[in-house]
Design a protein with these regions (language model features):
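Compact mixed alphabeta submodule
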Residues: 151-192
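Non-catalytic accessory regions used for complex assembly or targeting
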Residues: 1-81, 87, 91-93, 101-120, ...
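A generic structural motif
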Residues: 92-96, 172-174
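Flexible, charged surface loops at secondary-structure boundaries
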Residues: 79-82, 137-139
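"Short basic amphipathic alpha-helical interaction patches in structured regions
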Residues: 100-107, 158-164
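Active-site ExK catalytic segment of metal-dependent nucleases
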Residues: 54-55, 105-106, 146-148, 167-169
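A generic structural signal for short coil/turn motifs at secondary-structure boundaries
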Residues: 95-98, 154-156
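Aromatic/basic-lined ligand-recognition segments
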Residues: 125-163
Length: 242
């Protein structure tokens, strides 16, 4: 495996071979997520226990990202019982940009990962994003991805600092917590009630659970700062084998 920058809490704060902005943005992220009333109890607890993993993306160099993601997936296999998340911090813009800019950037990162993926797309995952069972995959693993950005003003739970922060959660961490199971439905309901209180907005209409036949997974990857349905086609394109 080539160069990889898979970091834990300590690495994000003190590594001397990474850009200076990384520690600052990790501090911003931590200040939000460690707020006692932060809606995602999973994220808060995992951060405290040093179970989350992170990396960074410089504006002009994405080359380490595929290997870093593979390192994370390998870590998941070592201790599958730990419900880890992976958060990618993108170098902040010199001036804050509109939400659509960050959404476009988000999809470019996912597309880049897909283009660099040398492993076979999972057989059980459709290749058409308009299929209700489609979801992003990398390294042979289905993964839930979601964007957070400084342009979110209403949805404060999605504003984690000056960086675009992309969260990646392998589908395996949701085993036993699926939305159509009592435990999963209860957990989601509790989190969504807390999110509603933080954001002072109702649940976004594109938020649902994986497997809902009326749901399109890609639409909840980067929701709006509002309660408007996301329209149009998915920006993601499955690569064509030559």
């Amino acid at each position: 495996m080539g160069e990889s920058y898979l970091l834990d809490n300590e690495g994000m704060k003190n590594r001397d071979d990474i850009p200076n902005w990384v520690a600052k943005e990790f501090n911003n992220f931590s200040n939000v997520v460690l707020e006692p009333t932060f809606p995602c109890y999973f994220g808060l607890t995992a951060l405290k226990k040093n179970e989350l993993r992170y990396s960074f993306l410089s504006r002009n160099d994405w080359s380490h990202l595929p290997n870093t993601m593979l390192s994370f997936l390998e870590l998941m296999k070592e201790r599958p019982i730990v419900r880890r998340g992976f958060f990618l911090f993108v170098e902040p813009e010199r001036e804050e940009q509109p939400l659509e800019y960050y959404r476009d950037y988000f999809w470019k990162v996912l597309q880049y990962l897909h283009e660099k993926d040398n492993q076979t797309w999972p057989k059980q995952i459709p290749k058409d994003p308009d299929h209700y069972l489609w979801e992003f995959s990398f390294g042979g693993e289905p993964i839930f991805a979601f964007g957070n950005a400084p342009a979110y003003k209403q949805r404060k739970t999605r504003h984690l600092g000056n960086s675009l922060v992309i969260g990646f959660q392998p589908r395996t961490i949701f085993d036993g917590l699926e939305g159509d199971r009592p435990k999963g439905a209860y957990s989601r309901q509790m989190v969504r009630e807390r999110v509603k209180k933080w954001d002072q907005l109702p649940k976004h209409p594109n938020i649902s659970h994986y497997g809902d036949i009326d749901h399109r997974e890609w639409k909840q990857y980067f929701i709006g700062d509002d309660i408007e349905l996301i329209k149009g086609k998915c920006p993601f394109h499955h690569k064509v084998k030559l």
